[in-house]
Amino acid sequence: MPKIKTNRGAAKRFKRTGSGGFKCVQSHRRHILTKKSTKRKRQLRSPDMVHPSDVRAVARMLPYT
């Protein structure tokens, strides 16, 4: 049986945690930052967890993590 291909886009965006979830970088921090408050930009720095309902789909895209 052939190997399953890893979705390369997903591999660059998600990392598996020790407890089996996935963490990802939050969006809205690339450009047009002048109108966003310092507090909002600081909070966007912290990693975000993938929602439990999406974990199965992400795990399917990353079979070897």
From Swiss-Prot:
Pfam families per the UniProt record, alphabetical: Ribosomal_L35p
GO MF entry, a single one: structural constituent of ribosome
Gene3D superfamilies, per the entry: 4.10.410.60
Keyword Glycoprotein in record: no
UniProt keyword annotations, A-Z: Ribonucleoprotein, Ribosomal protein
PROSITE patterns in the cross-refs: RIBOSOMAL_L35
Gene Ontology CC: one annotated term: cytosolic large ribosomal subunit
Region (Disordered) residue spans: 1-52
Superkingdom as given in the UniProt entry: Bacteria
Bias-annotated ranges (Basic residues): 26-44
InterPro entries: Ribosomal_bL35 (IPR001706), Ribosomal_bL35-like (IPR021137), Ribosomal_bL35_CS (IPR018265), Ribosomal_bL35_sf (IPR037229)
UniProt GO BP: translation
PANTHER family: 54S RIBOSOMAL PROTEIN BL35M, LARGE RIBOSOMAL SUBUNIT PROTEIN BL35M
Membership in a protein family: Belongs to the bacterial ribosomal protein bL35 family.
Name of the protein: Large ribosomal subunit protein bL35
Organism classification: Bacteria, Pseudomonadati, Pseudomonadota, Gammaproteobacteria, Methylococcales
Gene, per the UniProt record: rpmI
